[in-house]
Every structure is written in C-alpha cells, then in structure tokens.
Amino acid sequence: MNIIKRGGTEVPFDKSKIVTAILKANAQAKECDKLSNIDEMSEKIASHIADDIEGNLLSTGSVPNVEDVQDMVEEFISKSGKFKLAKSYAIYRYEHELLRKKNTTDDKILSLLNRNNEEINQENANKNPIVNSTQRDYMAGEVSKDLARRYIYPEDLMKAHDAGIIHLHDQDYQANTMTNCCLINMEDMLQNGTVISGTKIDKPKSFDTACNIATQILAQIASNQFGGQTINIYHLVPFVDISRQKIKKSLIKEFESVGIPYDEDKINKITENRLKEEIRHGVQTIQYQILTLMTTNGQTPFCSIFIYLDEAETPSLKKDYAMVIEEILKQRILGVKNQTGIYIAPTFPKILYVLEPDNIEDDGEYYYLTKLAAECSAKRMVPDYMSEKKLKELKEGNVFGTMGCRSLLSVWKDPETGKAKFWGRFNSGVCTINLPDVALSVMDDMLGEHDITEYTERDMSKFENLWSTKQDEIKEKFWKLLDERLKLVYDAQIIRHKRLRGVPSDVAPILWQHGAFARLKPGETIDKLLFDGYSTISLGYVGLYETVKSLTGKSQMDPSVKDFALSIVKHMKDICDSWNKIENIGFSVYGTPEESTTYKFAKSLRKRHGIIKDITDKDYVMNSYHTDVKEKVNAFDKLTNESPFQDFTTGGAISYVEVPNMTKNIEAVLAILKHIYNTTVYAEINCKLDCCQKCGYMGEISLIRDSNNKLIWKCPQCGNTDQNSMNIIRRVCGYMMNANVVNQGRLNEFENRVLHL
C-alpha cells in the first residue's frame, strides 16, 4: 500500500511513522493521560493502533494522503479512551503544521522538479510534468495557488474548498488577471488584420496562409488564457475563393507564357484540383500545428473548431465550406502517427459539428458529410454534435459554438446594431458546488448521525425510509442549506470578477487590442466587457445523481423523483438569474467536467459522511446531471432522459453515450445522430481507441489492479503495463485525452462505465 505525502509524492506506507508520532505525543502528555505508565506497554498500544489504521486503509482500496491518516490517528486514540492524549496529538500535529506553513510551496515544487509528484502527474492528462516548459508552468502555478490561498480568497472560502464543499477552479492562475475560455473573433482578425508579438499581420491572400495565421493566433490566445478556445471554420472559408482566383490567374499566366492554348473549362478543372490540394494542405496545417504547438501553459492549446454549414450566406460559399468540412473529416479519420508510426486518434482540435436539416435528413444535400462524420465518430471519437434545432429553441434562434469544451454563452445583443454577437466573447471562470455534500449534510442532520468517520458504513435503507415519511422537511432543509452553499460560490465569483476589473488592455494585447475579443486602446481597461452579460462567469455543479440518490434512494432519472431533480438545477438557474439582476454580471449554470475534482470530492464525501452504497463507496462523483455510469440504459433513452437538464444548464453541458466498436455499423451511429438532432443541445459518442506501442495492439486496453490495489492499464495481447508506452484515448470531461495518466478516481469511473448500445 502507498500513501500520498503533502508535497504530492506517492511513497510506500510505513506504519512505524504512526507509532513514532503517537509516542512523541504520548511523551508530552501528563502521566495520567498517557497510553500507559510503562514505555513498553505504550509502544505496544501504539503499534495496535497503527495495525488497526493499516487494516482500515487496506479495506478502502484507495490511496490515502497524510491528512487522512492523521485524522484516523486522532480518532483511534480517542476510541481507546485517551481523549486528552488525542488532544495532545492534535497539538503536536498543529505545531508541525505551523512549521510547514512558513513556506507552503517548497515541498511541492521540489517534488515536481524531482519528477515524483504523483498528484501533479495525474492532475491534467494533457500536460506532461516531466517536460521543462510544463514544469515551469506548474512551478508558477504553485506560487499562484499559495498567493490565492493567503491573499486572494478569505479563510471561509478556502476552508470550504479544502473540505470539498466547493471547488475554486484554476487557482494556479488566479494570481494573474487572465480569462478562462472564449470564442475567438477570427473573422475580424483575418479580415481586418491583427498584431502578433508586435508584428503586424495583414489580411491573408490565400486559404493556406489564413490557416497558418489562424493557428498562430490560437497559440497566442491560449497562452493568455487558462481555458479553451474555439474558432469558427467558416471564418476561413472566404479565403477559399481568394485562393481559387489566385490559382486561376496564375494558371492563365503560365499557359500564356509558354504559348499553350487553353479554354475556360480546362482552366477551371485544373484550378479546382489545385484548390483541393491547397485545402488539404491548409487543413493539415491546422491539425498538425495545433497538436505540435506548445503554449506558455505547457500544453497543446485546448482548441475546438466549430462547423455550422447553414451559416454560409451564399450557395457558392456553402459549397466551398462543404469542401473544407469534408477535408477536415477525412484527415481526422486518417488520424496522426504516434511515436511508433501507428495512426491513432489525435486529441485536438475538438470538432463541433452542427446537425441541421441539410445534413441530417437522408435526402439532404449535405447528408454525405454527416455520413462521413459518423464514420469519423466510429473510428476517432469525433466530432461532437450540436443540434441546430435545440440551440435555436434555447438561444433565441441563434446557433454558435461552445467555448473550448462545453461552456456556452448567453445571448448578448450589440446595442449599436441590435444583433446578437457571440464571437469575441469569453468566460471569466468557474466555481463548483459539491451538490451531494449538501444532500448528505441534510440527511446526517435528519438522522441525527454526526459521529461519522470515513470508515463508518451507513445503512441506505434509513435514507430511503426518511424520504418516504419526511419528504417535505427534507426538502425544506435541503433548499436552505443549498442557498447557504450557493452564497459561497457567489462570494468566490464576485472576488474573481473584481480581480479582472480595472485590468488594462495591455496585459494581453492580442485579446483586448487586436481583435480576438475587442479593439480597445492601449491603457484602456477591460471593464465594459465584464458587464451587461457580454462575458459570463459560471456556477458549476456536480453529482446530481448522488444528490438525488442520497435524499430519495432513487436515481435522478426515476420518474417518481425526476421533477425534483430538475427543480434543483432550475433553482440554480433562477439563483444565477437573480445574481445577474443584482450585479449586472453574466452568471450562468455550468455542468462541471471535474477531471481531477471528481476524486477530490469523492474522498471528501467519504471522509465527511462515511461509506454509503452507490454514493460514497467509489472514488468519483458523477459529472453534472449525468446518469450513473453503471446504470443500464440504451443510448436513445439516456439522451432523452438527460435532455431536460441541459435546458436549465444554460452555461454549458454535454451528454454522452458509450458504445462498442461501431466501424461496421455506421447506420446505428447515424440513428444516434438523428436522435441527438431532435432531443439534445450537445452530445458525443464514446468508444475505445487504444494502442500498445510495444506490440502494436489496437483495441481496448484493460484496466486491472496492481499489488497496491491501484488501477493501471494492461495490454491484453502482450501484458505490457508500462503506462508511458501506450496510447489510451478516452473522453474524460468533454475533451479526448491521454487516459493513461489520469487520477485513480477517474480510472474508477472508467472501470464502471457500461455500454449504452
């Protein structure tokens, strides 16, 4: 068994250290409070306590951290009847904590530099903490976290964060005045020119050049934000005809210069052939540049490309757009080569493909593109799909992309034109509420059960019986505590908002001065873009499944409690609407992806509320409103059941279905897409895309438990367990990522996923 130290390193568990700590506290206690007046007997009792603690830890199957073990030491000393000794141990622990607080970052930074910080290794599946540039970002992040903890956030918010009641996202960037995610106004930057690193960039004169400039813009913007970015591929489409005319003119000149006769038809055919080659090259530039560029965040840009065919203003633009879309899909189907030369699915850019009558109906002119998209989904797990029909219902007739992964803007109309604007807007950040903790805190109170440890096994039938007899009282207490917890989120987000107020445009010229968001003057503050709903700031939530299960004993999709589940999400939306009116800020409800937060919240729930079947007996919490990963439900019912929750999660959310290998059953994929079009704002199809670099195996690589009961990947063909010599692609939180380096909580969630088809 291993244990995670405070600095994040994972080391073998050594129970002798527990014995030593107990005996040191024992030595400071009065004679009457000691374990025994005889030293040998005290050591024997301390050893028994250490044995009991080790047994409890082994029974959980998870890797504990030092704080968990110290809590258990206090608890077990108290159980032995030595309450004053337990207090002495707490004082001993507190004194050592004060010494550590003199410098809160050294241990973590040193473990990072020594490449043995297990927490950081598993924190972000797209950041390799061994690489120098990534290490520098993590080092800066540790300093930022320290500043956020000691200077930016008040103690009550940090305590709530540490206890897992809320999660203050992206603390590693809070010291900086940076924004989260955005929709880049690429149209303005390409058509009117921009400035990159002090160099003036004029309007491109070809599609190929436009693609190259777009990727340079992306890298610059990603380095000035901490979240994802989305570009609209349609903003590149006008350059297709510019290239067409350029190629045509060049061809005529070539033919004339050598005296070869030509006709219009021949020129047009050659032009279109060369144009397709340029489109292929331009799309390839976007694909490879995004994958190989590294931002100052030490990672590939978290980039999405948005595809909405009906956006084209003319038939000719629509045909050019279709050519670009077709090439994007064909290149993604091909994939990119890994280190051993095997074609695999690239993780970026994410593709957002809008389903509309022209491309989803069998007789639609562009249905062939959706068939290609379905083939791509079956082989490479992209695109993600957005429904024109549902978006227009929820967003006042507008269709636009998510900002990076899932964050979705509200409608904002330019007061000068009266028209809705989306490209060039952004999100300021997220704070997430742990909904299951609200529910379990209420149930603990209702049951009068407060003396709970993380090893207390709870009787779920008590929860169910209480709901059947005291439903109204439970609801009253739940709404009251929920509002108290939401106030914490509100306070945190007001602090975040105020951090951005007064910031000059000079901090990120490409964002604020050169077109990505605005064309502000040097020295002008960004304040006007923080109000009136131009930008958003998010109230995230997780664990609706565990919340409803805790209160009622049923899944949130059970017809008898689904209305109550919906009322929880609606309540959060109503709260955000009220905050908007008070502050004139764009608060929105957001379905939090919780890549690493899922493990943190799961551990905190177990620590605060004990072991409860299907709620805290696992190492993860369900994303937002998602159905339990273990629940057996078909893909169509899952999407239908989850759809109403998206309607209230207006700040962005994703539904997904888990499917087997669908490369031989594209018709079934198309059936799912048609269902998405009719029911769901935003959804994706998950399959298994793995490759063992040692033997070349392509298929699903297995999850097993090693000798420390830790989940690891193992190749079913050659038995390889070297986690660094595999390509394991899973969709974790809306993004595809390298799942061989995610945390144990997320691996536990993978382990429990069932197929929906």
What are these regions (language model features)?
Residues 95-533, 554, 558-721, 727-728:
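Conserved catalytic cores of very large enzyme subunits
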Residues 1-115, 751-755:
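Charged, amphipathic alpha-helical regulatory modules used
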Residues 23, 27, 436-440, 547-550:
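Short connector loops/turns at beta-strand edges and beta->alpha or beta->beta junctions
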Residues 537-550, 570, 731:
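Contiguous, well-ordered alpha-helical segments that form the cores/surfaces of helical PPI scaffolds
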Residues 279-283, 287, 549-550, 737, ...:
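Metallocofactor- and cofactor-centric catalytic cores in central/energy metabolism, strongly enriched
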